[in-house]
Regions:
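Unchanged
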Residues: 3-323
Length: 323
C-alpha cells in the first residue's frame, strides 16, 4: 500500500511481532467463523478462509486464493494498528512474508463423507491409538496431521517456506526424517503396491537418479507402471509439497487468467481453475509431460517418507478402514 509521505511495504510486519510458522487453512464456508473458537487457536498464528462460493479454483488456484486472502488480512491488521484509513491505501505489488507457512486444503464439501460435511474432514475425531504416546481423547485429524508438517518445515532449507498438504489424509512417519534438499520443489512419496498407485499421483524417477524427478503422472494405468518399471522407479504422491518462493510465485502466476483483469467487487475474478498436481506437477521434472519453460526450469527433489504410512479419509469406507 502507498500513502502520502509513507511507503508501506504490505505484509512486512515488524520483526518482533513475526510468527515463526503460520498455519493457513482452506475450510468449508460454515466452519470459517467458528474454527478459532472450536480449536482454541491464536489468530496471529492461524488464518482460515474458504474458496469463493460457486467458484472451482482447484488446488493451485485455491492456494493462490488462500495466500492472497491471508496477505489481505495481514494488511488490514497492520493498517488498523497504525490507524491508517484503508480507503486511502493504494494496493501495490507485494512479495510473500518471510516466515514459513503450512497450507492445508480442507474445504471440500464431503459429498462422499456426508457425516462430516458440516465441520469438514479436518476436524474428524480420531480414536486414541493403542500403545501410542502423545494421544489425546479429544484429538482430531488436524491435531494428528500438524506435528509431522511442523517437523518437516523445521528441517527444511530457509528458502523452502511453503508447505502445501491435503486436509483429508493422515500421514505417519515411523522413522526420523532425512535431510531435505535445497530445491525449488520438494515432494514426499511412498513405495506402494502398483494397484494403489493407480488411484493417485505418481512420481517417476530414473533408476540411475532416484532422488530426481523425471516426470509425474496422474492415476496411471497398471500397464503404464509395468512398462516404466524396467527403467524407472515410482513413488506415490502423498500430498506433502514444499515450495520455494520462486515456485509459489509461478504457481500463483499460472493460476491467473491470461488478461489478469481484477474486478474490485469480485476479488477472485482474475483467477482460473488450476490444479497443483495435474497442471503444475505435470510441468515438473527432467522430462515433464507439460511444456512450460519457466516451470520446467524449477529444480525438483523427491523424497521417500521414512517409515511412512498413508491413510485417506475421502469416503465413509476409507474413514473406517483408515481408523
Amino acid at each position: 500500500c502507498q500513502l502520502p509521505n509513507i511507503i508501506l511495504l504490505c505484509c512486512q510486519i515488524v520483526s518482533n511481532t513475526a510468527i515463526d510458522m503460520q498455519k493457513l487453512l482452506s475450510l468449508p464456508p460454515n466452519l470459517v467463523s467458528a474454527f478459532y473458537e472450536l480449536e482454541n487457536v491464536d489468530r496471529t498464528e492461524w488464518f482460515c478462509t474458504s474458496d469463493p462460493v460457486g467458484m472451482k479454483l482447484g488446488s493451485g488456484g485455491g492456494t493462490t486464493w488462500l495466500l492472497r486472502e491471508w496477505q489481505k488480512e495481514r494488511d488490514r491488521k497492520y493498517l488498523a494498528e497504525e490507524r491508517i484509513p484503508t480507503e486511502k491505501c493504494i494496493p501495490t505489488e507485494k512479495s510473500l512474508p518471510a516466515e514459513k507457512r503450512i497450507l492445508l486444503h480442507a474445504g471440500g464439501q464431503s459429498r462422499r463423507l456426508p457425516g462430516y460435511a458440516p465441520s469438514g474432514k479436518i476436524l474428524t475425531p480420531i480414536p486414541v491409538f493403542r500403545w501410542a504416546r502423545g494421544q489425546k481423547l479429544g484429538q482430531n485429524l488436524l491435531s494428528l496431521q500438524l506435528p509431522l508438517y511442523e517437523k518437516i518445515m523445521e528441517r527444511a532449507p530457509e528458502r523452502l517456506r511453503t508447505l502445501i498438504a491435503s486436509g483429508d489424509v493422515y500421514i505417519r512417519a515411523e522413522k526420523p526424517l532425512q535431510e531435505i534438499p535445497d530445491a525449488d520443489v520438494v515432494c514426499y512419496g511412498l513405495w506402494v503396491d502398483p494397484l494403489l498407485a493407480t488411484h493417485h499421483g505418481v512420481f517417476i524417477s530414473d533408476r540411475n537418479q532416484p532422488e530426481s524427478l523425471d516426470f509425474m503422472l496422474q492415476k496411471p494405468s497398471l500397464e503404464e507402471l509395468e512398462n516404466l518399471s524396467k527403467t524407472h522407479l515410482f513413488l506415490m504422491d502423498i500430498g506433502i509439497w514444499l515450495l520455494s518462493d520462486r515456485a509459489v510465485d509461478l504457481l500463483m502466476k499460472r493460476s491467473q487468467k491470461a488478461d489478469g483483469a481484477l474486478d474490485v467487487d469480485t476479488p477472485y475474478s482474475d483467477l482460473k481453475y488450476y490444479d497443483l498436481y495435474a497442471d503444475f506437477g505435470l510441468s515438473l521434472g527432467n522430462h515433464p509431460r507439460i511444456e512450460d519453460e519457466e516451470l520446467n526450469s524449477l529444480s525438483v527433489a523427491i523424497l521417500p517418507l521414512p517409515g511412512g504410512e498413508f491413510y485417506h479419509y475421502g469416503t465413509s469406507r476409507e474413514l473406517l478402514s483408515s481408523t
